[in-house]
Amino acid sequence: MIRPRRIKVLVVDDSAIVRKILTDAISAEEDLEVVGTAPDPFIARDKILALKPDV
């Protein structure tokens, strides 16, 4: 059986605790994959260009 493609997610929040909670929750989902995290929009922009997340 072919597995569906996982949705790649970049988690962006200024709080390290919130990033950790979101990363753990998203990672628990079979169809989602956290490809990175960022603490601000400037770092997020660089990571979006490099990692090409879906969300």
List where the protein language model places each region.
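Non-catalytic signal-transmission and effector/linker regions of two-component phosphorelay proteins
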Residues: 1-8
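Acidic, metal-coordinating helix/loop segments flanking the phosphotransfer/catalytic sites
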Residues: 37-55
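Two-component/phosphorelay signaling modules centered on CheY-like receiver
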Residues: 8, 16-36
